Each structure stands twice: as structure tokens, then as C-alpha cells.
Amino acid sequence: MLGAGGVLYLTPMVFHQAHFSAGRVTEGLALAAVAGTLGRILCGVLLDRGLNCSVPVLMAALIAIAGDIRLIGTEAFGGYLQGQLLLGIAMGLYWPAIELAVPLSCAPVSSARAFALARSADALGIATGALGGALLAWRGLLRGVYVVDITCLLILLLVLLRRALPDPRPQDRLAHPSPLGQWLPALVPMLAITVLATAMPALMQSALPLDLVQGGLMRRALPESLGALTIGLQLGLLLLIQWPVGQALARRPVTTGLTLSLISFALGNLLLAASAFTTWGLPVLLLAQLPLALGEAAFLPTATEAVVELSPIEHQGLAMALLSQCFAISGFGAPLLAGRLLDAQGHAVGLWLLMALACLGGLLLVRDLAPRRTFG
């Protein structure tokens, strides 16, 4: 995730430098989100039929390298869309496989603790990548984030070619799966919560960088290097708190983590909106990064653990594909909405207030979930 950190969070700034409008930047991000839809479902179905998790991850790495190469050298909107299309397909193949690999690889550690550790590793990679991207932005080499990503992907290819991911699933369960109607309805509220909650990381990758460089109602616009550092601050906070938060929530029902996440996101959005109403908005904006990081730290391991609890082992590939598809739905819709609001209003106050209300409303869905583990 080190290379992905720079690509995910700093691509909007790369093409802001190329004089793309907010709408065009977010259209590319939305295309990337929707491009992996078929790949996700296909990946999930094949995983449930016994495909080793290593195969989709290897394919994703090769496609992502092609996408990075396309984005390095283009200044045209068409080239930008092509690069985002390739990255979207790669993410579609990657996420169901890598998420399923966590519970399959973690014995004798519980899957909840394993997801907390995996999310901590993700946070380390993304934060390091984004901070490295901020340094590249300061040096005027912002497109270097794609070179970093290619390097990391090549290392991933070498590691997986030397040692494949384990797959201890019982073949008799895979050969005789339970009907979808026995488990899918119970998963639906969790998927709806995921669409809502994952809109926040999508907006942190798309709308927040543009909000920072455009400025608020009274808040001054930030230079691109300082904007990248602000995003890096949130990712650094996420890195610091991901492991302790994930460990604490691993001992509690999934509803606890989801409630904490939605409340934290609502508070962070309110602070982001408030930062636009003063010339001294930067301290308020920086303060908002704390609840936003807490919300993400609480949600990411809890959501994947909830899916494991709510789905049988022979359908967990498809369940992880549906979970990652929720990321894609919010990744498609949230940037499009954000781009339209930013272009129409010239600021992001309405966007942040809308998201705060949506997160508070999402608490109603949490009540429909029930923990499936015993806690002591």
C-alpha cells in the first residue's frame, strides 16, 4: 500500500496541475471506481470455486503497473481516463482476494485481530506513500508517485511468485455451498453501512485535496505541497491509532466499532464545514483530521470482520467481492457529487454538511446488525 498511498491521495493534485476542472478530476476517479465491478464479482465467484487468492493479486499488480505508466506521461483527459480505468480494474481484482486471504492465513490468531493488523499495515503503507508524495510535491516531482507505485508493485510480484498465499478452506464446503438466501439478507444492512462509510475515504482522496487547493468561503487556498501535508497528517494519525483502536474493537461486538466510526465521521465533517467560515480555518481543518482518522480506524477492520461473521466460509469470496463493490459504489458516487458541488458552489461546505447528516442517519442501520461472536 506504500505506492498506492501516493497514487490514491495525490492523483487529484497531479491533474489539478494539468488544469483539469474538479468535475473532470472526479469523473476519472469515479470511472476507476466503477471499472472494477465485473472484476470484483468474477474474482469473488472464482475464489468460492477454489481459486487461490494469489492469482487475482498477481493479475492486479500487472494491470496497475500499466495504469501507472499511462498516467505518468499524459496531460490529456483521454489518457487520464485510460489510466484510471486500468487502476480501477486492478483494484477490482485485488481487494476481494487480499481480504479473503486475511482470515485464511491468520490461524491461530482470531480473524478480528488479524484484520486489525492488516489495516495497520495498510495505514503504514498509505501514510508513508502520501507523505512521500508530499515530499515529491515540494520538490516539484508530483508524478513521481507513479514511479514509487510501480516499484512497490514489482516487489509484490516477486514476493508472490516466490511464495503463494495459503488456502486451507475445506473442499467439501466449496463443492456444496449453502443457498444465498440463507446468509445474504443478513449481510444487506452491513453493505448499506459500508456504502455510506466508505464515501468518506473516497472524499478524502477526491474532494478534500480539491477543497484545500481551492479554499473555503473565508479560508485561504493552500499550496499543493501544504495540502498534501495536511492529507498526510490524517494518514499519520490513522497509522498511530489503527492498531490500538483495532485491537480494542476486536474484543467488542461489531456494532460498537460501526457506531464509533459513524459518529466520528459526522464530527469530522462538521469541523471541515466549519473551517470554511473563518480566515483562521486551517487549525479547525487540522483538528478535523483526528475524528476522521478515528472513524476510518474504527470502520475498516470492523467492516471486514462483520462480513466474515455474517457469511459462510464457502461464500466468503463473493461476500468480500460485495464488500469491495460497496467501496466502488461510494467511490463512484461520492466523487461525482463532490465534483458537481465544488464546481457549482466554489467551496465544499454543503458537501461536508450533507455527509455529516448522512453519517448520523446511518446509525439507524447499525441497529439491524447483531454480533455473532462471544466476548469475554
Stretches with model-predicted labels:
Residues 39-52, 240-254:
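Helix-to-loop junctions at the C-terminal end of transmembrane segments
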Residues 55-69, 256-271:
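Structural signature of the two symmetry-related core transmembrane helices
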Residues 87-98, 291-303:
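Core transmembrane helices of Major Facilitator Superfamily
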Residues 145-161, 351-367:
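Symmetry-related core transmembrane helices of the 12-TM Major Facilitator Superfamily/SLC fold
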